[in-house]
C-alpha cells in the first residue's frame, strides 16, 4: 500500500513513559488548534478506548485507534517481525486514509471524502502514543515509534522532567539516538521536544541549559516547558470510573488552551509540522458564518452520539448505489449504544458499511426492544457493571431479546456486551440480572483477570462458513486480532447441551491460552475486543449470518 498522502501534515506525540503527560498535552494541543481555527483529526496508538473517546469529544470527529500488530489478519508467531519502515499493512492504511476525511460531527448526512474539497480536509493528523515511545508488544510491534516509522510521521517527544535536572539531557539523547532492530538502522524522525512536570522557573532554566548542546548537535529543538503547577486537571480516565461524554463538561478548554499557548512555541511547532494558516474562521460553520456559542455547544454535544454511517460518509453515488451484491440483502446491524455500552472502535462502522451493512442504534437501558428492521445485534464493551440496576430493570428489552434469539437472530457481544448476554453479574457481593441469553454468570473482581494483545482462531462452524464455495472442513482458518482487558471472572451454568467456544485464543507470540467465549444457538459472546481492520473476514462471515436470518424471516 502506498504511503499516506503528504499533503496533510501529521504529528505523533510520543513520551518517555506512562504518566509523562502525553494526554494532557495532546488534549491541550487539540483545544489550542481549535481556538486557532484549525481542524485536527486525532488518533490513539494501541487498543485504548478511553483516550480516543476524549479526542473525539473535543474535536467532534471520530478518533481512530492505530495499531501495527492488531491490523493484520494472520496467525501469531514467535518469529513474527515488526514490518520494516515504509511497509504499511492494508488495514492500517485504510484506517489512516479515513483520518484524511473531515466528517460532519453535527448529525447531518454530509461529509466529503479527502481530496474532493481541500477545505474539508483536516489541517493536522495528531496521533497520541501509548506508554513509552519504544514500548510495544513482541519485538516492538505496536509501539508508538514503530507506527510513526511506518506512517512516515515525525515525533514530538514528551520528556517527563519531574525530579530531574541535568539528567534530562541523557534521557533525551537516549531516546533520540535509539535504533530499534525493526528500523533497519534508521532512526525515528523527531520534530521537537517538550518537557513536562516542570517545577519552577529556575527548574525550567536548568532544563533549557542542559538540553541546549543536544538541540544544537541534533537539530531537534526544545519547543515547550510545561509547568506542573497550574497544569489543567483532567477527570480520571481509568477503566470503569468515567466516560468521555460524562467528563467533557468538566474539561476547561480555555484553561487547556492558555496553558499550552503560554508554555509552548506553537507557532514554531506548527511550522515545523507543515501546517498552513487556516482559511476558515474560529467557531464557524461550513459557510464561514460565525456559529453562536449555544449552537456550537449543541454541536459538540451531538458529537457524542453513537458511531453510525455518518461518521465515515460515502460519496452520494456510493450511498445511493451500493454494490449489486449488497442491494438484495443488505443486513441491518443494531448497535447497542448508551451509557452502559460505549467501547466501540471508531472504524467498526466504516468496516461494516464497506462490507455491506447498515447500522442503527438502540439502548438496552431505555428502549423496550431493538429497532424492528434489525437483522443482527452487536453489543460492544462498556460499563454494564456501573449500570447493572438499570439494565436489570428493563425487563421489556430482555423479553424482546429472548424472542429474537428464539427466532434465530444473530447476536454478538464483546467484553461488557458479553456480560450483558449472561445470566447475571455480581458486584460487591450483590447480584444483578442480565439478559439471560447465555448460560454464564460472572463476578467483578478487584484485580485484572486478563490483559494483552490477542489472536484468535474461530471455530470451524462459527460464525458461518468462511468460503461458501468450499466444504466447511476445507475452509481456510479464520483469524482475528484484538485485545483483552477485564476484571471479571465467569462461571459456567451446566446445561444438557453445553455452550461451545467461539475462539481458540493465543497471545501475541502465538502461545495458546484457552478456548474462549460462549455460543448457544445464534447468540455468542467473548471477552475479546476484535480490532476492526484485524477482523474483516470475521465480520464478513457474521454479516452473512445476518443476511441469511433476514432472508429466512422476511417475505
PLM region spans:
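Amide-donor transfer/coupling interface in amidating biosynthetic enzymes
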Residues: 2, 232-279, 285-288, 293, ...
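Structural motif
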Residues: 12, 124-128, 156, 194, ...
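ATP-dependent carboxylate-amine ligase catalytic core
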Residues: 2-151, 159-189, 201-205
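Internal gly/pro-rich beta-alpha loop/helix module
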Residues: 165-284, 292
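Phosphate-binding active sites in nucleotide-utilizing proteins
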Residues: 332-386, 390
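Cysteine-nucleophile active-site neighborhood
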Residues: 384-465
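Intrinsically disordered, low-complexity terminal tails and inter-domain linkers enriched
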Residues: 77-123, 180-186, 277-328, 461-477, ...
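A short helix->loop->beta-strand "cap" motif at the edges of active sites that frequently abuts
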Residues: 153, 220, 407-409
Amino acid at each position: 500500500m502506498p504511503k499516506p498522502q503528504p499533503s496533510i501534515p501529521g504529528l505523533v506525540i510520543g513520551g518517555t513513559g506512562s504518566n509523562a503527560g502525553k494526554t494532557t498535552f495532546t488534549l491541550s494541543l487539540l483545544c489550542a488548534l481549535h481556538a486557532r481555527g484549525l481542524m485536527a483529526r486525532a488518533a490513539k496508538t494501541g487498543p485504548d478506548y478511553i483516550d480516543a473517546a476524549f479526542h473525539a469529544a473535543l474535536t467532534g470527529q471520530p478518533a481512530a485507534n492505530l495499531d501495527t500488530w492488531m491490523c493484520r489478519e494472520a496467525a501469531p508467531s514467535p518469529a513474527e517481525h515488526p514490518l520494516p519502515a515504509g511497509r504499511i499493512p492494508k488495514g492500517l492504511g485504510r484506517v489512516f486514509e479515513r483520518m484524511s476525511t473531515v466528517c460532519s460531527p453535527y448529525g447531518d448526512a454530509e461529509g466529503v471524502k479527502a481530496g474532493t474539497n481541500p477545505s474539508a480536509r483536516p489541517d493536522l493528523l495528531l496521533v497520541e502514543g501509548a506508554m513509552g515511545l519504544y514500548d510495544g508488544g513482541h519485538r516492538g510491534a505496536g509501539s508508538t515509534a514503530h507506527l510513526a516509522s511506518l506512517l512516515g510521521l515525525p515525533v514530538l517527544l514528551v520528556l517527563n522532567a519531574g525530579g530531574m535536572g541535568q539528567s534530562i539531557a541523557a534521557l533525551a539523547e537516549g531516546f533520540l539516538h535509539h535504533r530499534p532492530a525493526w528500523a533497519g538502522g534508521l532512526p525515528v524522525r523527531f520534530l521537537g521536544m517538550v518537557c513536562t512536570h516542570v517545577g519552577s522557573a529556575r527548574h525550567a532554566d536548568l532544563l533549557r541549559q542542559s538540553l541546549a548542546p543536544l538541540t544544537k548537535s541534533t537539530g531537534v529543538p526544545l519547543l515547550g516547558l510545561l509547568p506542573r503547577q497550574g497544569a489543567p486537571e483532567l477527570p480520571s480516565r481509568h477503566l470503569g470510573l468515567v466516560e468521555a461524554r460524562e467528563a467533557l463538561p468538566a474539561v476547561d478548554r480555555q484553561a487547556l488552551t492558555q496553558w499550552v499557548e503560554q508554555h509552548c512555541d506553537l507557532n514554531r511547532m506548527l511550522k515545523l509540522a507543515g501546517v498552513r494558516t487556516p482559511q476558515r474562521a474560529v467557531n464557524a460553520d461550513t459557510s464561514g458564518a460565525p456559529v453562536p456559542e449555544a449552537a456550537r455547544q449543541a454541536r459538540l454535544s451531538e458529537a457524542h452520539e453513537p458511531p453510525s454511517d455518518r461518521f465515515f460518509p460515502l460519496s452520494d453515488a456510493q450511498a445511493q448505489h451500493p454494490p449489486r451484491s449488497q442491494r438484495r440483502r443488505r443486513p441491518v446491524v443494531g448497535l447497542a449504544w448508551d451509557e452502559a455500552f460505549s467501547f466501540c472502535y471508531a472504524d467498526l462502522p466504516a468496516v461494516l458499511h464497506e462490507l455491506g451493512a447498515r447500522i442503527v442504534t438502540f439502548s438496552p437501558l431505555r428502549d423496550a426492544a431493538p429497532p424492528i428492521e434489525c437483522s443482527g445485534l452487536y453489543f460492544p464493551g462498556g460499563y454494564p457493571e456501573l449500570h447493572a440496576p438499570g439494565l436489570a430493570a428493563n425487563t421489556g428489552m430482555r423479553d424482546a431479546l429472548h424472542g429474537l434469539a428464539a427466532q434465530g437472530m444473530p447476536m454478538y457481544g464483546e467484553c461488557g456486551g458479553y456480560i450483558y448476554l449472561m445470566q447475571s453479574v455480581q458486584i460487591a457481593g450483590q447480584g444483578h440480572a442480565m439478559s439471560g441469553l447465555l448460560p454464564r454468570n460472572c463476578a467483578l473482581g478487584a484485580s485484572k483477570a486478563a490483559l494483552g494483545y490477542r489472536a484468535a482462531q474461530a471455530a470451524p462452524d462459527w460464525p458461518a462458513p468462511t468460503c461458501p464455495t468450499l466444504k466447511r472442513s476445507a475452509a481456510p482458518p479464520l483469524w482475528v486480532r484484538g485485545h483483552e482487558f477485564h476484571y471479571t471472572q465467569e462461571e459456567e451454568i451446566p446445561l444438557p447441551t453445553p455452550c461451545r467456544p467461539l475462539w481458540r485464543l493465543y497471545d501475541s507470540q502465538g502461545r495458546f491460552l484457552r478456548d474462549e467465549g460462549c455460543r448457544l444457538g445464534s447468540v455468542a459472546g467473548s471477552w475479546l475486543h476484535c480490532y476492526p481492520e484485524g477482523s474483516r473476514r470475521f465480520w464478513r462471515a457474521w454479516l452473512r449470518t445476518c443476511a441469511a436470518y433476514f432472508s429466512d424471516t422476511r417475505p
